[in-house]
Amino acid sequence: GDPYVLMLERLALPSLGSSGSAAEHLGDIDPRSFPALDVDIESLSIGDKNYGRVGFDLRTDLFGAHFLALRGQVLGIDLGDASRQNALHWWYQENGRRGSQLKGKFAVRDMGKVLSSLGYERSLETRSGGFDVNVSWPGSPDQWAMSASQGRVKFALKNGRFLKTSDAASGALRVLGIF
């Protein structure tokens, strides 16, 4: 049948906390059981942090859940609009193993603001940039870890400069250096 349509002006979720219990519960979910949904949230916050505007079309099949047509702007990253092929896949295998994949082209204006929103020191600033991503990792989407990821990330940042920062900011620059 037709997907349910969910349009929210605001969605405020509690902080996940440091216990990790919420992540353990997500790992127990069979992503194939989700209903078909077209979701648009104007303002998403988790705990005290506002993530921005997000939307997706959720579909499931025998292989898992597929968050298609990612759209909106989250933490300064432009997810695109419904016409793009940006997607997050949550795979399910019969042996109970799960995996996730993020695939698409995403844009940023000021990479410094993105770094800051992710908890890093603002070590560079840009006027524009883009990322072409095809990355997968074991587990549910919230279990992403760079060390467990495989795939490719291509990026181009334009009209920018590195800023003088503390030694702590070198961690963010090392992240860029990995790619």
Placement of each model-derived feature along the sequence:
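Small-residue helix/turn framework positions
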Residues: 3-16, 31-50, 55-179
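Long, charged amphipathic helices and adjacent flexible linkers at domain junctions
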Residues: 17-31
